[in-house]
Amino acid sequence: NRIDHNEIQTPVGLANTGMEGFTMEEQKVIITIARQYGSGGKTIGQMLAEDLQIPCYSIEILRMASEDSGINEMLFNQADEKLKGIHLFSKAKGVYQGKVIPPESDGFVSNDNLFNYQAKIIREIAEKESCVFIGRCADFILKDNPNVVSVFVHAPKDYCLQRALERSSMNEKEMLRFMAKTDKYRSDYYHYYTGRNWLGFEKCVEEIKAYIKVRFS
């Protein structure tokens, strides 16, 4: 489902969703949120998690992957930053195969394996509990999970710009450049690890079908 934040007039809440009386004990639900920079997707995800009284995971995945793998968390953070600065994404690689590389292998601390460990954590959490995932290609990693609802949050450029400027010391020109760079990185990151476009035709078809199934079931 694609959400234009500019159309949201009231905070996300059970009273506005037709979910009155619904509890997470009745049905496990995993919500994945991808978002444009400045659209408020992270805030929406956090609000939704609080409203539904379920955990919300974002950057915490790096710490959990570090603890699970024994790889220093700094390497996970460095990989995120390093990937932003190189032309790694010229071609879709689709490296995610659903398994991690063992410690005795040469590629144990490679960027690809760091992603594999994040994916492992995401799958394990989704098996255990209802939750919200923000970013991290979670929608693709959990694409075969029938309990997943995937959302892409976007907003008009002027809205994203104004919201981003309120939280930064950058001027308008600098922020526009930063927003474009960040969204391109997120799109390229997703394309590289999944082989799919961030929200291409294929993804739109999947989301429409998923919504129809929920709406009329």
What residue ranges belong to the model's regions?
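Short, Lys/Arg-enriched N-terminal segments with co-localized hydrophobic residues
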Residues: 1-23
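Pre-Walker A (Motif I) flank of P-loop NTPase domains
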Residues: 27-31
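Glycine-rich phosphate-binding P-loop
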Residues: 33-46
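Short beta-strand-centered segment that lines the nucleotide-binding/catalytic pocket of NTP-utilizing
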Residues: 55-66
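Conserved beta-strand scaffold positions in the cores of enzyme catalytic domains, especially
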Residues: 56, 148-150, 206-207
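ATP-dependent small-molecule kinase phosphotransfer cores
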Residues: 66-130
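Small-molecule kinase domains that catalyze NTP-dependent phosphoryl transfer to phosphate-bearing small molecules
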Residues: 83-94, 171-211
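ATP-dependent NMP and nucleoside kinases share a basic, alpha-helical "lid"
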Residues: 119-168
